[in-house]
Amino acid sequence: MTLAAHTTEDYEELLGRVFDDQVKAWTAEAEASERFPRQLIEHLGRTGVFTQKWGDGQQPDVAKLIALALELGRLGSAGIGVGVSLHDSAIALLRRFAKNDYLRTICEQAIRGEAVLCIGASEISGGSDLQIVGTEVRSVRDGYEVRGVKKFVSLSPIADHIMVVARNVDHDPGSRHGNVVVIAVPTSQVEAQAPYRKVGAGPLDTAAVHIDTWVPGDALIARPGTGLAAISWGLAHERLSIAGQVAGASQRVIGITLARMMKRRQFGHTLYEHQALRMRMADLQARVDMLRYALAGIAAGGRLDLRAAAAIKVTAARLGEEVLSECMHIFGGSGYLTDETPLGRWWRDMKLARVGGGTDEVLWELVAAAMRPDYDGYDELIDSPTGDD
């Protein structure tokens, strides 16, 4: 057994101990109140979940990232899973790009669960275009003035620091392109608005944040021109986590639906004995298995790749939506009753996977940008019609 495999197994055992009945109770309470339990982040930090995942390096242990994501997915709460992964993705930003003690202290506090982090990227107009940033940063008094409004800032009502994507206007105030920075802003210096009412993921406290403050120079995480690269790194971490959460959630739902099929009888037979339903479930299981194997392959590679994270997130999200829809269908009328089964809530939750962390189309563009045509193969096998050359 390799050392890497041994340490990953140790981490999985740690997760098995940490995600106990107390975590399940916090999750159930959060679903009822639609508020994220800060004590969960504190618990994960105190028990070493983030410390063991990150170690001393700037790069995440990808196998442990995926192991944590699978465990979060099995909780059956997208709001809880995504909230934890967003906090951890902000840690990823700081671990790689923090260059001073001020930022390193924030990072280590977050790893210990003593501080909660969130990311402010989307502008008030919404959307995924981070190249056009309205929030402005100006150099003032050995620090920076930060002004703007961020629309979708999950965890902002309970967080201590926001990793804000902004635009430096020191040299080109009129331009809305380029000069993107990432800067840490304490939530004590901003105005978090009332959390939105959402279709699903109730516990994921998400609100607009109004920013008009000054922060010290050491709060700058990524200097002008490097902000997009930095936030892309954090997003890749989030996307890979979402894929793992979808895999964990999908497997749990399939297992519960299969139990339903074994127990429920219609027309003199169990649902499982009806071939059409059984084949439908087998198809879903096969594809969820393939997703899990793909995640294992990424874990074995040991590298957080931006394109691979985009590809597996969009593929997982679309599969997860299908899994939930089909399983809810197999539950029949009971699946549509929120007081009888959680299928309807899980179905609504899964939609977030196709929107949060980048929509399908944004992620497909990242995949498309890395595709390479095989001109040699084409020329060898295909006769070009006259006029093509």
Swiss-Prot record:
Keywords: FAD, Flavoprotein, Oxidoreductase. Transmembrane segments: none annotated. Catalyzes the dehydrogenation at the alpha-beta position of ACP-bound acyl chains. This results in the introduction of a double bond in the lipidic chain, which is further transferred to the epsilon-amino group of lysine residue in the mycobactin core by MbtK. This is Acyl-[acyl-carrier-protein] dehydrogenase MbtN. Its EC number is 1.3.99.-. The keyword Magnesium does not apply. PANTHER family: LONG-CHAIN SPECIFIC ACYL-COA DEHYDROGENASE, MITOCHONDRIAL, MEDIUM-CHAIN SPECIFIC ACYL-COA DEHYDROGENASE, MITOCHONDRIAL-RELATED. It comes from the Bacteria. GO terms for biological process: fatty acid beta-oxidation using acyl-CoA dehydrogenase. Pathway: Siderophore biosynthesis; mycobactin biosynthesis. Gene3D superfamilies: Acyl-CoA dehydrogenase/oxidase, N-terminal domain, Butyryl-CoA Dehydrogenase, subunit A, domain 2, Butyryl-CoA Dehydrogenase, subunit A, domain 3. Its cofactor is FAD. One of its GO terms (molecular function) is flavin adenine dinucleotide binding. One of its GO terms (cellular component) is cytoplasm. InterPro entries: Acyl-CoA_dehydrogenase, Acyl-CoA_Oxase/DH_mid-dom, Acyl-CoA_Oxase/DH_mid-dom_sf, AcylCo_DH-like_C, AcylCo_DH/oxidase_C, AcylCoA_DH/ox_N, AcylCoA_DH/ox_N_sf, AcylCoA_DH/oxidase_NM_dom_sf. Belongs to the acyl-CoA dehydrogenase family. It comes from Mycobacterium sp. (strain MCS).
